[in-house]
Design a protein with these regions (language model features):
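N-terminal lobe/hinge region of extracytoplasmic solute-binding protein
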Residues: 50-104, 137, 211-215
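Gly/Pro-rich hinge or "lid" segments in bacterial periplasmic/extracellular proteins
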Residues: 83-87, 185-242, 246, 256, ...
Length: 551
C-alpha cells in the first residue's frame, strides 16, 4: 500500500500549505545555449537525479523507499500504472478490470486480468500469465520478506485459462485491488520474471535484487553501492523508446552538497526538496521549483505497546504538546497543512469534519495527571517505577528532523516527558523487517518520518491488527477491532460513495486513539533544470510517465 504511497520514507521531504494547484517558479538566467537551445551545463538526453537517501535494495517486494519507488516506476513490471490525474491506466493489462466492463464479477469476488501480447522482459524473455501467477505465489510465500501482503490473503484460487489471462478468485470483494495487486502506486510488489527466480526457495537474497530485470521504458545498468544507480533505455519496451538516453540516480547524503550541485549544474533534478532549501533552490538561475499538493503526510508514531504510551490519554497528551505551527514556521519555512487525519485533502476519501488539535500544554498536563503519571524531583513524570522517557529514533543526516525533535523536547519537558535521541542510517532505519530494520522491527519508542497516502484512502495496511510487520506497515502496532471492522467494510466495496462512511469511521477512531500524531500534510517539491521537458509528476507515482521526458 505505501511505498510512495508506498511507501515508505524519510521526513526530509517537505511539507507545505496546499495551494489550489501546482505552482512553479524559475529564476531567469542569461547564459549561452548550444545549437539545440540547451544550457551549456546540460548533457543532452541525460538526466542526473540527486537523492539524500542511501538505497537498501532495488526489489520493491523487499524495500520501501521513495527513491526505490521512483526507479521501480521506470524499470519494473506493473499491471497498472497512473496518469497525471492519479487515475489508473493499463500497463501490462489491456484494460483495468471493473464491474462495469465485466472484469470484476457481479459479486465482486472474481477479477480477470487480460494481459498484453508480445511483451518481453528487459533480458528478452517473453512475458505471460506464468509470470503473474508465479509473482502472486511469491507474495503469498511466507519465506519472502515482503514489505506488504495487504489484500493478498483474500486470494483463494488462481486460474490461468491461457497464457494471457489470469483470474483471481477472492474470499470477498476487495476495493484496493488496483493499487495493491501489482499496481505501481503504494508499497506494493511488482510482477517478477519467473524464468529467473522460480528455482529459488525465496527471493530475499537473490542475485536478481542487485540489478532486477523488469518491463519498463528503462532498465538497470549499474548499482554502485552508496554512490549511484544508472538506468538506460530498455530497447525491448513494448511502448517504444523513451527520449532520455541515460538516468543517473546520485546518492548524496548531505543536502547542502545537493544544493551546491544544483547550483553548479552537476545535477538536473532533486526531489523531495526539504522545506529549508525551497527558497534557495528556486533562486538558482536555470532551475525551476515545482510545488504541488502531496498525498504524503509527516507523522509521529508511538510504539503503542510500549508501557509509556499504551494509554491513549498519554498519546493524546503528547499530541497536545506538539506546537506544529512553531515547527512549520521555524523548520518548514511556513509550509505545511496542519490537520489530524492522514488522508490528503486532495484525496476524495478525506474527511473534512475531523477537528484540528490545538497546541495546549495545560490540557496535556491534565491528561497525564489523569493517566496517573506524577512528576518526580527531576521534573520527569513516573508511574510504577517507570519514567516517562522515550527513545526517539530518526535518520542520520536530516538536520530538519533534529531541529524538530529539539523543539518538541523543549515543550515536552514542560509536561514532564523526556527524550533520548537515537540516530540511524537511512538504509538501516528503513531496511526490511527480517534484515533488522529499525522502523519495521519496532526498535524505537517514538519516531518521525513520512508515509504516502493510499490512492483510494485505504488505511488497512497502516492500522489493521493484522498488519503488524512483516505482514504490513502498522509499525505503531496499533490494534482496534472496531477500526478493523470498518476497514473490512471499506475494502469490500468497489463504489467510492458507498465506502466513504467507513473511511470516515476509521479517521474518527484514529483521531481519538492517536496511534500516531499527524504532523502535517506535505507538498511535493521538485527542483529541476529548466531544460527538462515533458516532466509532469502526479501525486501517487511521479515517475510513471517518463516516455516523453527529455533534457
Amino acid at each position: 500500500m505505501k511505498r510512495w504511497l508506498a511507501t515508505v520514507l524519510i521526513v526530509t521531504s517537505f511539507a507545505g500549505c496546499a495551494p489550489a494547484g501546482p505552482s512553479q517558479s524559475s529564476s531567469s538566467v542569461a547564459a549561452t545555449t548550444d545549437a539545440g537551445g540547451r544550457h551549456p551545463w546540460t548533457i543532452p538526453h541525460q538526466l542526473r537525479y540527486a537523492t539524500a537517501e542511501d538505497i537498501a535494495g532495488l526489489n520493491p517486494h523487499l524495500v520501501q523507499q521513495n527513491v526505490v519507488s521512483y526507479m521501480s516506476s521506470l524499470t519494473m513490471a506493473w499491471l497498472v500504472k497512473y496518469d497525471h490525474d492519479n487515475r489508473p491506466i493499463p500497463e501490462l493489462v489491456t484494460v483495468v478490470p471493473t464491474q462495469q466492463n465485466g472484469g470484476i464479477s457481479a459479486d465482486g469476488k472474481t477479477i480477470t486480468w487480460h494481459l498484453r501480447h508480445g511483451v518481453k522482459w528487459s533480458d528478452g524473455a517473453p512475458f505471460d500469465a506464468d509470470d503473474v501467477v508465479f509473482s502472486t505465489k511469491t507474495v503469498l510465500n511466507p519465506a519472502n520478506n515482503e514489505v506488504s501482503r495487504d489484500g493478498w490473503d483474500l486470494i483463494t484460487k488462481i486460474d490461468e485459462p491461457d497464457k494471457y489471462t489470469v483470474i483471481y478468485h477472492l474470499r470477498k470483494p476487495y476495493a484496493a485491488y488496483v493499487p495493491n495487486f501489482f499496481g505501481s502506486a503504494g508499497a506494493n510488489p511488482c510482477v517478477l520474471p519467473k524464468h529467473l527466480l522460480a528455482t529459488l526457495p525465496n527471493i530475499n537474497n537473490a542475485p536478481y535484487n542487485a540489478l532486477p530485470v523488469g518491463i519498463g521504458p528503462f532498465k538497470y545498468a549499474s548499482w554502485k553501492r552508496a554512490d549511484s544507480v544508472e538506468l538506460v533505455p530498455n530497447p525491448l519496451y513494448f511502448r517504444g523508446q523513451p527520449k532520455l538516453q541515460r538516468i543517473v540516480f546520485k546518492i548524496i547524503p548531505d543536502r547542502n552538497t545537493v544544493t551546491t550541485q544544483l547550483q553548479t549544474h552537476e545535477i538536473d533534478l532533486w526531489t523531495p526538496v526539504a522545506a529549508a532549501y525551497y527558497d534557495r533552490v528556486r533562486a538558482i538561475p536555470g532551475v525551476t521549483a515545482l510545488r504541488q499538493p502531496s498525498y504524503f503526510f509527516s507523522h509521529m508514531d508511538f510504539q503503542n505497546q510500549h508501557p509509556g504510551v499504551s494509554d491513549p490519554r498519554v498519546r493524546q497528551a503528547l499530541r497536545f504538546a506538539i506546537d506544529r505551527r512553531q515547527l512549520i514556521e521555524k523548520v518548514r519555512h511556513g509550509l505545511g497543512i496542519i490537520q489530524d487525519t492522514p488522508i490528503s485533502p486532495k484525496n476524495p476519501a478525506f474527511d473534512p469534519h475531523i477537528p484540528t488539535v490545538p497546541f495546549d500544554l495545560a490540557r496535556a498536563n491534565a491528561l497525564l495527571d489523569q493517566a496517573g503519571w506524577s512528576r518526580g524531583p527531576d521534573g520527569i513524570r513516573a508511574k510504577g517505577g517507570h519514567k516517562l522517557v522515550f527513545d526517539f529514533a530518526t535518520s542520520s543526516g536530516t538536520p530538519d528532523n533534529d531541529t524538530i525533535i529539539e523543539l518538541i523536547r523543549a515543550n515536552w519537558q514542560k509536561i514532564g516527558v523526556g527524550i533520548s535521541v537515537q540516530h540511524y542510517p537511512a538504509a538501516l532505519l528503513f531496511a526490511p523487517y527480517a534484515s533488522g530494520g529499525i522502523v519495521l522491527g519496532g526498535k524505537w519508542d517514538i519516531i518521525i518520518f513520512q508515509w504516502g497516502g493510499d490512492v483510494i484512502g485505504d488505511l488497512k495496511n497502516l492500522f489493521a491488527c493484522t498488519s503488524f510487520p512483516p505482514n504490513g506497515q502498522n509499525d505503531p502496532r496499533y490494534c482496534n477491532p472496531q477500526v478493523d471492522v470498518a476497514m473490512a467494510h471499506f475494502q469490500a466495496l468497489y463504489s467510492v460513495k458507498a465506502r466513504q462512511p467507513y473511511d470516515d469511521i476509521v479517521q474518527q477512531h484514529l483521531y481519538t486513539d492517536v496511534p500516531d500524531a499527524i504532523m502535517w500534510i506535505n507538498e511535493d517539491i521538485y527542483a529541476y533544470n529548466t531544460d527538462l521537458t515533458g516532466f509532469h509528476p502526479n501525486q501517487v507515482t511521479p515517475f510513471d510517465d517518463f516516455m516523453n521526458v527529455d533534457i
